[in-house]
Amino acid sequence: IEAVVRAVGVPHVTVVKPYKVKKSIEAIRAAIDFEGVSVIISQETCALYAKSLKLARRKPFEVTDKCRNHRDCMDNLACPAFYVWNERIKIDPNLCTGCAVCAQICPENAILPRKEKKVTA
């Protein structure tokens, strides 16, 4: 796609990984500020599609005790892994694709990769 866009003469082409939230926002701002035609190409396998292909799975995330219930993760993302239990935000590890977007937008840095639970005999 990038080669085609450049071949037709687009002067401002940026390729981003959409799961890198800050860099994606920077690219969008640069495209808006650019005088002329600008194209942003988001290049990443869809997390749900990757899961269906059984590609290497990323570690699921969990909401830690640092969460202050601002709910930015639920209000700003359409992630099916989020749910509310006893007035606390939770992440279903079976639905979490490990994309880490929620962790990047959490104002408390309360969303972290899930720790493996050790089973004792």
Task: Indicate where each model-derived feature is located.
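Conserved thiamine diphosphate
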Residues: 1-27
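Structural motif
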Residues: 12-14, 37-40, 88
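General beta-strand structural signal in soluble alpha/beta enzymes
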Residues: 14-17, 41-42, 113
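Glycine- and other small-residue-rich loops at beta-strand/loop junctions that grip anionic moieties
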Residues: 16-17, 65, 94
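Flexible loop/turn segments at secondary-structure boundaries
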Residues: 21-24, 47-50, 98, 113
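Glycine/aspartate-rich loop-and-adjacent alpha/beta segment that forms the canonical ThDP
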Residues: 30-84, 116-117
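Iron-sulfur cluster-binding cysteine motifs and their immediate structural context
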Residues: 68-92, 97, 101-119
